[in-house]
Amino acid sequence: MAANKGMAIGIDLGTTYSCVGVFQHGKVEIIANDQGNRTTPSYVAFTDTERLIGDAAKNQVAMNPQNTVFDAKRLIGRKFNDPVVQSDMKLWPFQVINEAGKPKVMVSYKGEKKAFYPEEISSMVLTKMKETAEAFLGHNVTNAVITVPAYFNDSQRQATKDAGVIAGLNVLRIINEPTAAAIAYGLDKGSHGERHVLIFDLGGGTFDVSILTIDDGIFEVKATAGDTHLGGEDFDNRLVSHFVEEFKRKHKKDISQNKRAVRRLRTACERAKRTLSSSTQANLEIDSLYEGIDFYTSITRARFEELCADLFRGTLEPVEKSLRDAKMDKAKIHDIVLVGGSTRIPKVQKLLQDYFNGRDLNKSINPDEAVAYGAAVQAAILMGDKSEKVQDLLLLDVAPLSLGLETAGGVMTVLIKRNSTIPTKQTQIFTTYSDNQPGVLIQVYEGERAMTRDNNLLGRFDLTGIPPAPRGVPQIEVTFDIDANGILNVTAMDKSTGKANKITITNDKGRLSKEEIERMVQEAERYKAEDEGQREKIAAKNALESYAFNMKSAVGDEGLKDKISESDKKKILDKCNEVLSWLEANQLAEKDEFDHKRKELENMCNPIITKLYQSGCTGPTCTPGYTPGRAATGPTIEEVD
């Protein structure tokens, strides 16, 4: 497949599900995967024989919970000792280890212990999305726009970009999910005059509220707020806890320590939750959930709403906060846009509607697909798409957190305020604190607190060689420059000497080095080749099996009774049975072994079948077009990844 230089895709890399779209022929296509689903679970599973990504990974999670990795987005760009990582680790069935301060996921793959960075897991999901798009478009795709929550800090954005590189993508830009949804919305509406839009994005794992102004094709993010740990999974957890208690009451047994039982229960709870968005009651039927006990139960919508009442009500706090940040009254909001699968929950919609005094909510865009839709449009814009639908769109994003440096006494001096439109550049003059000070330490922080110790250190560097002078005399010009991806460059220059030093905020926060990314790219290629090898192996096994069965049924055919001697018939049947029992015992043999066995079987059967031809036989093996020695090549049914 040749790459199409002018085509770029938009990927919504979600905590629980991902989605990919492409802008072509003047409209966005959301692309279905090989299972026919327009969203793909952000799951990667490792087994003794293969690696599975997406639906195939999620479908086997109950049998293999320790080696099925999800929620990589909760780990990406974070340190191991981050409180979020520490609290989430208690809930995950897979193991997370600490390697030089960074979290890695430990799994067993092909009988060996392997540890992966979150970037590598996310890159596998991105590879799946890339392949989904390539299968649809019929050519290679390398250019992509990837979305992240508005709340992601610099290191999380950078790590997401790295994941794209490992997956073999050229990441044109990282954009905020609500911004992407606004683009989708702007295209849908063809806006006239300035409109204030509130985007309420409640997905599988994160919750974001953003306020944007759309005016004449220009999008500006006015404020963002949210909760990095609220979403559909939390509602599932409430249901799981509820049913674990119910099981205890009914059967006097605690299933909470049995990972497989909990996982099966969780799958049923997720299904019940979806049902409750359109029905007022859902039934759960799980056969042999624990110690042979069948669990049949039901739940009403009202009970579900009660179980999650505090979580649902809590979604309004970020709405209020973003309105305060944008200095806007709720009456000034023109449109309320729902994004994310969890916004289908009727109670969530009702709370939001009541808060906005009964205003209609905008549900015209499929909430699961809005973000990928907008990312696909943005990808087309960046590739210079000339379609009038996208021509007039301009995109202004914001810095999610204030950026600044430490000054005397550990004070946070802000250069770029939170919610500033990016790209942006700010310069300020600083000076020395003591006489004849030869250098200054520039320490860069992000956060909203007054003291740097309460904020997040991004990086530090020294500017040395300042000529001796009394305190307060030297002039040091510090520039903060954020590009469109939200990546920060900080420069400090001594104005008297012109001497300067700079830092690009990446590495200090645990960004992967070039070498590590290079290694991961190669490993990703290797895994892809292994996956390919696995598919070929299965094809060879199936070919051998179907050939053996075909031969058995051919020689057992009534019409051939007189045409084939008993000894020949016995020879073929014995050999076929021998091959089939070898197959039973050697399911994991190599491709070459399967091919070799088939050759062996063909060499024995071909002369006998050829003899039949020459004797002018009739029957299934003698129909025109039947080639001896060729396995049936009907559709191969196998577990797809």
From Swiss-Prot:
Record SUPFAM superfamilies: Actin-like ATPase domain, Heat shock protein 70kD (HSP70), C-terminal subdomain, Heat shock protein 70kD (HSP70), peptide-binding domain
CDD domains given in the database record: ASKHA_NBD_HSP70_HSPA1 (cd10233)
Keyword Nucleotide-binding: yes
Keyword vocabulary terms for this entry: ATP-binding, Developmental protein, Differentiation, Nucleotide-binding, Spermatogenesis, Stress response
Pfam families named in the record: HSP70 (PF00012)
Family per record: Belongs to the heat shock protein 70 family.
PANTHER family per the UniProt record, alphabetical: HEAT SHOCK PROTEIN 70KDA
Its biological purpose: Molecular chaperone implicated in a wide variety of cellular processes, including protection of the proteome from stress, folding and transport of newly synthesized polypeptides, activation of proteolysis of misfolded proteins and the formation and dissociation of protein complexes. Plays a pivotal role in the protein quality control system, ensuring the correct folding of proteins, the re-folding of misfolded proteins and controlling the targeting of proteins for subsequent degradation. This is achieved through cycles of ATP binding, ATP hydrolysis and ADP release, mediated by co-chaperones.
Subunit composition and interactions: Interacts with PRKN.
Name of this chain's protein: Heat shock 70 kDa protein 1-like
Organism: Mus musculus (Mouse)
